[in-house]
Regions:
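N-terminal mature ectodomain segment of secretory-pathway/periplasmic proteins
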Residues: 22-113, 210, 215-217
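Short, acidic, Ser/Thr-enriched surface-loop or helix-capping motifs
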Residues: 33, 183, 207
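Short, exposed beta-strand-loop hairpins at the edges of beta-sheets
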Residues: 196, 202-207, 211-217
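Bacterial N-terminal signal peptides
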Residues: 3-13
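Boundary at the C-terminal end of the N-terminal hydrophobic targeting segment
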Residues: 15-20
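Tryptophan-centered motif/residue detector
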Residues: 81, 132-133, 151, 205, ...
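Solvent-exposed helix/loop surface patches that form functional interfaces
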Residues: 22-25, 90-191, 216
Length: 217
């Protein structure tokens, strides 16, 4: 079982982050814990300019057995928003050697998706430079879908999300489990716990300001 718990939670101190009641500061960091051991981190950075928002995600996990790394996971993503409207996403993932890359952008009445066709044989060079026209497949998704990148509390009210690793549509059912107190490195936070079932299975906690504070897979 993998648990992500926020290390430090603060609202923005500048006008850019305070505008439109945006609930986060410039960054958000989580410790990733498995069986009581910290195995990595999940970090987000938020860059806001007027109605424009860029969210960058960095995930690094490593599970070790007797001092040897038995499993490694890396994920990098950048998503762009205009107000409440999702505009685009670019993501690359290395899931213990299985490398994938996706790009999603708003295109008229749909979301246009590109992803590499053969993730298990994507070369390091291609992985580093992203998708190329000769090794990608293209699909479309409904325009109202949101990324499954955890930070946006609106995702608990959705019937489907975009899997940010594969670019596929993930159908979900989300139920409210109740209120709990989450301990961070410097505080305790009252939060609501949500349970996802369907194509995504996890529990997620948001505080009263709509800030993501914990996830359990």
């Amino acid at each position: 079982r993998l648990i992500l718990t926020v290390l430090f939670l603060a609202t923005g101190s500048t006008a850019a982050y305070a505008a439109d009641n945006f609930p986060y500061g410039s960054s958000l960091s989580f410790a990733a814990v498995r069986n009581g051991q910290t195995i990595g981190h999940h970090r987000l950075t938020f860059q806001k300019s007027g109605t424009q928002l860029k969210v960058s995600t960095e995930i690094d996990l490593a599970v070790k057995f007797m001092g040897v790394t038995a499993y490694r996971y890396m994920h990098r993503a950048e998503e762009f928003w205009n107000g409440d409207t999702f505009q685009s996403l670019a993501a690359q993932t290395d899931d213990d050697g299985k490398k994938t890359a996706i790009r999603i952008r708003r295109d008229g009445a749909a979301l246009a998706v590109e992803r590499n066709a053969r993730p298990d044989v994507l070369s390091p060079a291609k992985f580093d430079r992203g998708l190329q026209r000769d090794d990608s497949i293209r699909t479309t998704l409904p325009p109202q879908l949101l990324p499954s990148s955890h930070w946006n509390v609106r995702q608990v009210r959705q019937a489907a999300l975009i899997n940010t690793q594969t670019g596929a549509e993930a159908r979900v059912q989300v139920s409210v489990l109740g209120r709990e107190t989450i301990r961070t490195a410097n505080d305790s936070i009252d939060a609501t716990r949500y349970r996802y079932t369907g194509d995504l299975v996890m529990d997620q906690w948001f505080d009263d300001a709509g800030r993501w504070v914990k996830t359990s897979f």
